[in-house]
Amino acid sequence: MSGRSCKGPFKILVLPGDGIGPEIIKEAVKVLKALGEKKGITFNFQYGLIGGAAIDERGVPLPEETVELGKQCDAILLGAVGGPKWDNLPPEIRPELGGLLKIRKVFDLYANLRPVMFFPELKNASPLKPDIIEGVDILMVRELTGGLYFGEKKRFTTEQGEQAVIDTLIYTEKEVERVVRLGFELAQKRRGKLTLVDKANVLESSRFWREITGEIKKEYPDVELSYMYVDNCAMQLIRNPRQFDVIVTENMFGDILTDEGSVLAGSIGLLPSASLNGKFGLYEPIHGSAPDIAGQNKANPLATILSAGMMLRYSLDCPEEALLIEKAVKAVLQKGYRTGDILEPGTTLVTCEEMGDLVAEEILGGVYDEGLPL
């Protein structure tokens, strides 16, 4: 593409985290280095602590030096956080709340992007019939820093002496507008369809979302907008997932629907995610730290590798290079290589490290037609 520059140097903050995090992040960095060698891109990797690893070494799940490093970088690549070792700590200093949720808030990463992709090579791994799942390509956009999860929470005793609880759901116009606008922009670059998922028949906050979305729609006449209640959406994702292109929703609904969507692909070991604030983003696999297989070279690094691909696309403005990573992953799967979580009869079992090697080798040696679709 003429006039396009994807040479860097790009500064990437790498946060291996806990459990299988260090193993899978190592393979993603390996693939990025191979891409750099192939395409002449300079990556400068900085390493920091987060989660349980940070608690063990610094006493807090998100050290200030990690935040400062992030402010100097173009993007953050994260492995995974958490594990039973830290489950008995107070919630605010556990790896998840004090590390992952806090870094999202510190960098105001307001939009979570999760692609739901169909891999023909894994059609038997999905719980849905192949004729339902075939061709599915959904991008879920979840608001990430507002709503119930971040509102005031309290317990109290009523005048009648009964225990009661309040969780507060608050959204500002700005919080809604920025994530909805991102959804429209993404839909423009895809198939031109946006579905706002809510509960507007019950919730005032959902009616607020609809009003703002309807106004923004006027700026995007080329995007088809539809509305769907969250309960119906949960059903439609199973009955007819191909109807969706871009789904936009608030924090809690998005939390549930993105997990449901992750099952469609057949393995959460394949699904990446991005949490964005404009061009800056944090990229991570959607799966957890899997402490039961940590250190055994069994983990599937493909979701982390594909997260690095998303980083190239959304933060570094390198869409062609992102596509190269995605094609390399697809080529490795087509050749029958599998980690244990997606192993099928007739396929070849490889370790975490070997899978990273295979994708890196595919990037360095693979020959791709630029017009070849994924």
From Swiss-Prot:
GO terms for cellular component: cytosol. Binds 1 Mg(2+) or Mn(2+) ion per subunit. Its cofactor is Mg(2+); Mn(2+). Its EC number is 1.1.1.85. Transmembrane segments: none annotated. GO terms for biological process: L-leucine biosynthetic process. It catalyses: (2R,3S)-3-isopropylmalate + NAD(+) = 4-methyl-2-oxopentanoate + CO2 + NADH. Pathway: Amino-acid biosynthesis; L-leucine biosynthesis; L-leucine from 3-methyl-2-oxobutanoate: step 3/4. The keyword Translocase does not apply. The record marks Y149, K199 as: Important for catalysis. Mg(2+) binds at D231, D255, D259. NAD(+) binds at residues 83-96, 288-300. It is found in: Cytoplasm. Its main location: cytoplasm. Substrate binds at R104, R114, R142, D231. One of its GO terms (molecular function) is magnesium ion binding. Keywords: Amino-acid biosynthesis, Branched-chain amino acid biosynthesis, Cytoplasm, Leucine biosynthesis, Magnesium, Manganese, Metal-binding, NAD, Oxidoreductase. InterPro entries: IsoCit/isopropylmalate_DH_CS, IsoPropMal-DH-like_dom, Isopropylmalate_DH. The keyword ATP-binding does not apply. Pfam families: Iso_dh. Homodimer. Belongs to the isocitrate and isopropylmalate dehydrogenases family. LeuB type 1 subfamily. Catalyzes the oxidation of 3-carboxy-2-hydroxy-4-methylpentanoate (3-isopropylmalate) to 3-carboxy-4-methyl-2-oxopentanoate. The product decarboxylates to 4-methyl-2 oxopentanoate. This is 3-isopropylmalate dehydrogenase.
